[in-house]
């Protein structure tokens, strides 16, 4: 397959934290990114530098926390004003991933706070078949207007809280949202609460 680009953008997937997502279980995602002309590479955040020309850096559901030094690497990557092309960090979370104070503090600097629990849907029209954890999410009109992302399914998702919309030169916004008929299941949720959940 020919790629008609001078510089192929790089998607760099960070490793070294017993990630739940890896090359072995996200081959379809990697194939999709490569079909969009990304070069997909992996690297160890602790022992290696972020690969040159990385445009998207993915933190793929780690199960152990990042060190302060690794977080500083991420900040340097995002604050590099010598780069012409925009850069992004994509973080995936799991509902039971546990406490990660360094990674959580970094995300909160950018206006996002991962919450405990599992997002579930009560409206059968907004879920896949009869799986309440297979939630259909809605693109936000102002960001993804005129797009083709209207049938996106989010499985086993952790809820995220947006802490602010603007803070100094940082803007935070939602790309996709769940419906008002969703609720969050936590380890403290009783059977009675699950049978008659409080929704938004």
Residue ranges and their predicted role:
Residues 1-200:
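Short, surface-exposed patches at the edges or C-terminal ends of soluble domains, predominantly
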């Amino acid at each position: 397959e020919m790629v008609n680009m001078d510089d192929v953008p790089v998607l760099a997937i960070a490793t070294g934290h017993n990630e739940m997502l890896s090359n072995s279980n996200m081959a379809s995602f990697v194939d999709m990114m490569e079909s969009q002309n990304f070069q997909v590479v992996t690297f160890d955040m602790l022992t290696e530098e972020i690969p040159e020309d990385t445009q998207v850096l993915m933190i793929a559901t780690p199960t152990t926390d990042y060190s302060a030094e690794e977080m500083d690497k991420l900040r340097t990557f995002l604050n590099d004003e010598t780069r012409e092309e925009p850069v992004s960090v994509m973080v995936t979370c799991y509902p039971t991933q546990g406490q990660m104070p360094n990674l959580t503090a970094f995300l909160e600097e950018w206006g996002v706070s991962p919450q405990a629990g599992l997002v579930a849907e009560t409206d059968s029209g907004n879920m896949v078949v009869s799986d309440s954890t297979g939630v259909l999410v809605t693109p936000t009109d102002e960001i993804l207007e005129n797009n083709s992302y209207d049938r996106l399914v989010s499985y086993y998702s952790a809820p995220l809280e947006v802490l602010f919309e603007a803070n100094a030169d940082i803007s935070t916004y939602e790309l996709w949202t769940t419906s008002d008929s969703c609720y969050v299941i936590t380890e403290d949720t009783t059977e009675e609460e699950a049978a008659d959940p409080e929704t938004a």
